[in-house]
Regions:
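Flexible, compositionally biased loop and terminal segments
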Residues: 1-253
Length: 253
């Protein structure tokens, strides 16, 4: 074992040993950013970058299991990403489909899709639906795979779903306007029934949310990590948890 690897392991163990698992976030959202830049820096192809990022996911979920995280939301494909050239998009969708199948077949995690299924190719829709069905009763971390996801799209879809529900009930616009509140909209989000994210991690050094979980992250803590997603290490994850535990969450008060 190289000296650098030994020092890294000892340091990671030290950071982990000082973590208070009771203070750990229960729901972590992750913006998996930097695959293409990692590939460029490594002299690889864009597809190789996306594959390296996909390979990191199960490793990261293992770290979440070790630290008692209950829900993880992984932003794998945004609505904007669907506008990429077909020569890049189709291989990326193949990687996402294979990754979701792998998460489902692993047997440790319950997979749930968040996003607009209707804007995705039929094959991708099928893979996501089958993964949900196959893992419905798994007693493990709930893994939200955000594919075809956009924060503004989610809110628009929630409002549309709410309006259609009340239209079926015969509720007039005046009646709906009188009773409408935050909870009514929250009940129609992709993540309805789930806790909001306590911590949102974004890799690659970008310090913006880009529309990720706009509604749910109102009181989330954010951690921006300089490394590209494929290079994200356990020690980076542990540092994010350490940083989160050191903060005093005010929830707007």
């Amino acid at each position: 074992m190289k000296l650098r690897d030994l020092v890294y392991r000892l340091y990671a163990r030290r950071v982990e040993g000082r973590l208070d698992h009771d203070a750990a976030p229960k729901h972590i959202g992750v913006i998996l950013d930097g695959n293409r830049r990692w590939a460029k820096a490594s002299g690889g192809t864009t597809e190789q970058g996306h594959q390296a990022g996909a390979d990191k996911i199960s490793e990261m979920l293992g770290w979440c299991t070790e630290t008692d995280v209950e829900v993880v939301t992984l932003w794998m494909l945004s609505t904007d990403n669907l506008d990429r050239p077909e020569v890049e998009l189709r291989p990326l969708l193949n990687i996402i489909e294979n990754t979701v199948r792998g998460l489902a077949s692993d047997g440790r995690w319950r997979v749930h899709h968040v996003g607009n299924l209707d804007i995705l190719p039929a094959r991708t829709q099928t893979v996501l639906k089958e993964a949900e069905q196959a893992t419905h009763d798994v007693d493990g971390i709930l893994v939200n795979v955000a594919v075809g996801y956009g924060g503004r799209q989610e809110i628009a879809d929630a409002v549309r779903s709410l309006l259609l529900e009340h239209a079926r009930k015969g509720t007039s616009f005046e009646e709906l306007a009188e009773i409408l509140d935050i909870d009514h909209i929250a009940e129609h989000l992709y993540t309805r029934g789930q806790p909001d994210p306590d911590l949102v991690i974004r890799t690659s050094g970008e310090q913006r949310l880009s529309g990720f979980m706009l509604w749910q992250s109102a009181h989330s803590e954010y951690y921006f990590c300089e490394v590209f997603w494929p290079a994200f290490r356990k020690v980076d994850f542990l540092r994010a948890l350490r940083d989160y535990a050191a903060r005093h969450r005010r929830y707007g008060t």
